[in-house]
Amino acid sequence: MKLAIKLAYRNLIGAGLRTWLNVIVLSFSFVVIIWMKGIMVGWDHQAKTDMKNWEIGGGQYWQENYDPFDPFTLSESHAAIPVSLNDEITNGEIVPSLIVSGTIYPQGRMQSVAIVGMNPHQSIFMLPTEKLDTTTSAIPAIIGSVSSRNLKLNVGDYVTIRWRNVNGMFDATEVVITGIFSCNVPSVDVGKIYIPLEKLREMMSLKGEATILTFREEQSERPEITGWSYKNTATLTQSVDELIQTKTVGQSIFYAILLLLAMLAIFDTQVLSIFRRQKEIGTYIALGYTRREVVGLFTVEGAMHSILAAIVSAIYGLPFLIWMAKSGWTMPIEASEFGMAMAQTLYPVYSAGLVISTVLIIVLVTTVVSYWPSRKIAKMNPTEALRGKLQ
């Protein structure tokens, strides 16, 4: 085996430009596949982290009628907070929020919004709710940067909001924008306006009630509470998992095409090599090599393309991958337009398992492709091969 590796290496280096063209193409596959997989892993990690910091915390209780995709359920999506959770709420380990449907009138225009009541002193979310603890002539409110852009509102602007209370009566008041935040989770930003929780309860005549109860830390088990539905972080981030899985399948097709082109070059090189080196093959057999050993020699020779490609890709790919991990890949279009948790700049994450699995898969595929044309050697007549007769 050691001799076969030495011979294979000598033959590859002796082939000159043909070898290095194959190696460069294959090394490009290494770098691109690892980078694109790293982008997907980084997006998954970043999206879930942002959702935990801005929206879901360590899990939630939803009022049983609440459906985030059906605004018509908001009028019934409220209930008294369970007494068993009062201690955790007092300690800041659970943050209650009340969500009601409303209408906002910026510059005389009308737009539907979800009015969210939030405790100004909460510390679970990264929302700047401390800006709700402000003394003003109107109700203090904060909105996201996308909502600010859509509604054409800035800090200090006054705007009218209208809502329908629990008794079915419509009412309206003015709010003043005391803060604008920027986040990567559209469901926290788009179509929502945040005001103090107690003020919203007073407006709606819903004292002590909430729509969502968010925990600071995730626990393996939470008690079942009548009228409330428990949602762990796995359930709340399921949409991200499904999206990443769909994107991964699409990327796999691209990986297959990229590998197919590289493997086609390897296959053609092997076929040409066997065709041109029939005398050499006959000489190996005459010197005592078995057909199996000669097939193994050519297979190792083809497989070594992937080893050399891994070395070459490490030379120029490692600095590129490190640079991308630090500076990130900025999306060419506004990420908020996708309607999902996605940062404008994605930072790839390269795990040891990702790199090792990619290298092993490419080496294995290259070995199989190299062996495929090498099987022809087993059918050759060594005498005819020594004479140089084409077979």
Tell me what each language-model feature is:
Residues V31-Y61, L321-G328:
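Alpha-helical transmembrane segments
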Residues N165-S252, L258:
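Mechanotransmission and gating elements of multispan inner-membrane complexes involved in transport
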Residues G16-V41, Q245-G282, A303-Y316, I361-V368:
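Hydrophobic alpha-helical transmembrane segments of multi-pass inner-membrane transport and secretion
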Residues I311-T358, Y371:
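Short helix-loop junctions at transmembrane helix boundaries
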Residues T49-S101, A114:
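Membrane-proximal extracellular/periplasmic loop immediately following the first transmembrane helix
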Residues S97-V100, Q111-N119, E130-L197:
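Hydrophobic secondary-structure segments that place a key small or acidic residue at a functional site
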Residues M1-I34, D44, N53, G388-Q391:
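N-terminal Sec/SRP start-transfer signal
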Residues E280-A325, S357:
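Transmembrane alpha-helical interface segments in multi-pass membrane proteins
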